[in-house]
Amino acid sequence: MLYNILFPLSSDYTILNVFKYITFRSVWSLITALILSILLGPYFIRWLQRINFKQQIHEDVKIHKSKTGTPTMGGVLICFSSLCSTILWSDLTNIYVWLTLLVFIGFSFIGFLDDYIKILHHQNKGFSAKVKLLAQVVVAGIAMLFLVSEPAYSTKLAFPFFKSLHPDFGYFYVPFAILVMVGASNAVNLTDGLDGLAIAPVIVSIFVLSVYIYVTGNVKFSQYLQVDYIAGVGEVAVFCGALIGAGLGFLWFNAYPAQIFMGDVGSLGLGGVLGFLAVLCKQELLLLIVGALFVLETLSVIVQVGYFKWTGGKRIFRMAPLHHHFELKGIPESKIIIRFWIISITFGLIALSALKLR
């Protein structure tokens, strides 16, 4: 909004030229969302406590009984802070910004309804898996239909570390992209089981993808680093900045011991938009590296369920997802969280190195 209002005046006031720089607006978008979420956090937490929007703890995780009653739906705070900051600092005529917001709001709304059902019925289960999956596919599908209709966007796939490999998926690209978004959404949802466990890796992943998005939308950088150029995509880096800031602000209250949980409104929304950002900058496969922690958590569930059915009741892990396995082994929660953060940062750096190693 500020860009649309102030930048046209730069011919008369040269200081306003600063608004044309995506990097400047991304940084201030981050700062704005961070301040907004930290300032609103205490009031929001008290309001959730007053209306009794509290977390229902899974009955199998007995060591988490002390967390029962902690306010949930903190993802609303992330969503509100990042949306306000994005609208304030981004170019509101950019189609890619609006598509990103569509995915973020859509997936967050699915999570919101899921959380509300849990709270309303005082249980740990909301939507059925089929209903939730269908809703996610619909939101992702609508976004993809708009995205592939953009002339600058292609259905080719990029392979990390292999600059000359760009197979065209054609009609199969849209279902593939939907799979990426839905998969990322549910992977983050599975990871969100300990205080601060999911939000920090999400921040790391968003930061890495924001670099790729900025490069993808910059003619010179994309040519130098041999990344597919997509005009206008770089503006989404402003949204990424807002989401990082809102995430950091949420972590202020979600760090161990948590004062608030993000709920499905946070995990589904963040995961869905994480997948869309990867699709947007043509780094769908890189997401496997960027979000390696989410992949590991998801695989632990798949392996556990598959092995349980195959052997008629035996388990590989004490409990899945993976973070619960380590909890039941007696490792302190705070240590598990920090170690998982280290894993996330390490894979984030590996993903960044792929920019040059092409």
Swiss-Prot record:
Pathway: Cell wall biogenesis; peptidoglycan biosynthesis. Pfam families: Glycos_transf_4 (PF00953), MraY_sig1 (PF10555). The keyword Cell membrane applies. It is found in: Cell membrane. It is a multi-pass membrane protein. It catalyses: UDP-N-acetyl-alpha-D-muramoyl-L-alanyl-gamma-D-glutamyl-meso-2,6-diaminopimeloyl-D-alanyl-D-alanine + di-trans,octa-cis-undecaprenyl phosphate = di-trans,octa-cis-undecaprenyl diphospho-N-acetyl-alpha-D-muramoyl-L-alanyl-D-glutamyl-meso-2,6-diaminopimeloyl-D-alanyl-D-alanine + UMP. GO terms for biological process: cell division; cell wall organization; peptidoglycan biosynthetic process; regulation of cell shape. Disulfide bonds: none annotated. It is an enzyme of class 2 (transferase). Its EC number is 2.7.8.13. CDD domains: GT_MraY. InterPro entries: Glycosyl_transferase_4, PNAcMuramoyl-5peptid_Trfase, PNAcMuramoyl-5peptid_Trfase_CS. GO terms for cellular component: plasma membrane. Keywords: Cell cycle, Cell division, Cell membrane, Cell shape, Cell wall biogenesis/degradation, Magnesium, Membrane, Metal-binding, Peptidoglycan synthesis, Transferase, Transmembrane, Transmembrane helix. Its cofactor is Mg(2+). The chain crosses the membrane at residues 27-47, 69-89, 92-112, 133-153, 169-189, 196-216, 233-253, 260-280, 285-305, 335-355. Belongs to the glycosyltransferase 4 family. MraY subfamily. NCBIfam families: mraY. Catalyzes the initial step of the lipid cycle reactions in the biosynthesis of the cell wall peptidoglycan: transfers peptidoglycan precursor phospho-MurNAc-pentapeptide from UDP-MurNAc-pentapeptide onto the lipid carrier undecaprenyl phosphate, yielding undecaprenyl-pyrophosphoryl-MurNAc-pentapeptide, known as lipid I. This is Phospho-N-acetylmuramoyl-pentapeptide-transferase. It comes from Lawsonia intracellularis (strain PHE/MN1-00).
